[in-house]
């Protein structure tokens, strides 16, 4: 009997992606984050869809419509907070996924890695425009500050900012277009994720040793499906705990004040997941320089395959590279903390040091550590 799972054009794709996919036998829990990101995306699209049914993208009613969702819509409060905290979970999974790729040398799959970098930019753009929609103080001023960065571009800057705003300030037109972007981008992300997966399945997954694992493969189902379900349950548990016990833990109190163009909040600061980039932006005294550093802090990921000097793919057996990697993680956590602090004496200088260290680690120290290891191993 011919198995429909393996012959039907549509079922065949699903089968080769989630069922009969040959998977390395030794991949660790760090390989769970890909499926968790897929789960996050589906969850965000679904909660977002239900929020969009009750939201009005208009300066006069946006803030009230969010309040209406929380108070009058059945289970609106949980949909709203799942969506807001789901974004934080999305970024936690995203950074873990990228960290895994850096540590185990998964960036050697160049197409997969480059599409991943594009995905990161798209998700960041989506999160930014989404944060503007509730039209609170932080939404409004966040939009003003970040879109204003375009004005740092020489000659065309000012025109470009007014073009993005659709006027001479962040106003009705800006909110409406941001809602349109926020609605369309997740579907673009879904398409890009499929392409990301397509390129990954051309080569097969990497594994913790960084050695080709064609000799030792297992079917994805049931081994990895059950493992992914466990990861998903832990993700849902974390998200629900956060949403039901401390929904405003990661939010900003200033966003419970309706947007007012005449009064600036004490400290404009982005959401938890953008603080490291914000700290890098702030640490450079020049506007254009700051914008370039901000862009480069993410774009640098695309250059990592070119900076790989080691004769080994993974960092699993390379202690000096590990030290540099964990120093980078600590540096990013430091930047995240500083991004949330006011621009005062100790923080300003610490932010500058942490920003310099960030680029130094990636561009100089990590490639150097790999070169030293090669020498020590007489390779």
Curated annotation (Swiss-Prot):
Give the record's GO CC terms: mitochondrial inner membrane; respiratory chain complex III
What residues bind heme b b566, as annotated? 97, 196
Q: Which GO terms describe its molecular function?
A: metal ion binding; ubiquinol-cytochrome-c reductase activity
Q: Which domain of life is it from?
A: Eukaryota
Q: How does it sit in the membrane?
A: Multi-pass membrane protein
Keywords tagged on the record: Electron transport, Heme, Iron, Membrane, Metal-binding, Mitochondrion, Mitochondrion inner membrane, Respiratory chain, Transmembrane, Transmembrane helix, Transport, Ubiquinone
Cellular compartment(s): Mitochondrion inner membrane
The entry marks the following residues as binding a ubiquinone, namely 201
The record's annotation in InterPro entries points to: Cyt_b/b6_C (IPR005798), Cyt_b/b6_C_sf (IPR036150), Cyt_b/b6_N (IPR005797), Cytb/b6-like_sf (IPR027387), Cytochrome_b (IPR030689), Cytochrome_b_C_euk/bac (IPR048260), Cytochrome_b_N_euk/bac (IPR048259), Di-haem_cyt_TM (IPR016174)
The record's remark on the cofactor is:
Binds 2 heme b groups non-covalently.
* Residues annotated to bind heme b b562: 83, 182
Q: Which GO terms describe its biological process?
A: mitochondrial electron transport, ubiquinol to cytochrome c
The record ties this protein, via Gene3D superfamilies, to: Cytochrome Bc1 Complex, Chain C (1.20.810.10)
Q: What is its main location?
A: mitochondrion
Cofactors demanded by this protein? heme b
Q: Where does the sequence pass through the membrane? A: 33-53, 77-98, 113-133, 178-198, 226-246, 288-308, 320-340, 347-367
Quote additional remarks.
Heme 1 (or BL or b562) is low-potential and absorbs at about 562 nm, and heme 2 (or BH or b566) is high-potential and absorbs at about 566 nm.
Its quaternary organisation is: The cytochrome bc1 complex contains 11 subunits: 3 respiratory subunits (MT-CYB, CYC1 and UQCRFS1), 2 core proteins (UQCRC1 and UQCRC2) and 6 low-molecular weight proteins (UQCRH/QCR6, UQCRB/QCR7, UQCRQ/QCR8, UQCR10/QCR9, UQCR11/QCR10 and a cleavage product of UQCRFS1). This cytochrome bc1 complex then forms a dimer.
Q: Which family does it belong to?
A: Belongs to the cytochrome b family.
Protein function: Component of the ubiquinol-cytochrome c reductase complex (complex III or cytochrome b-c1 complex) that is part of the mitochondrial respiratory chain. The b-c1 complex mediates electron transfer from ubiquinol to cytochrome c. Contributes to the generation of a proton gradient across the mitochondrial membrane that is then used for ATP synthesis.
Q: What is this protein called?
A: Cytochrome b
Q: Which lineage is the organism of this entry classified under, starting from the top rank?
A: Eukaryota, Metazoa, Chordata, Craniata, Vertebrata
Which gene name belongs to this protein?
MT-CYB
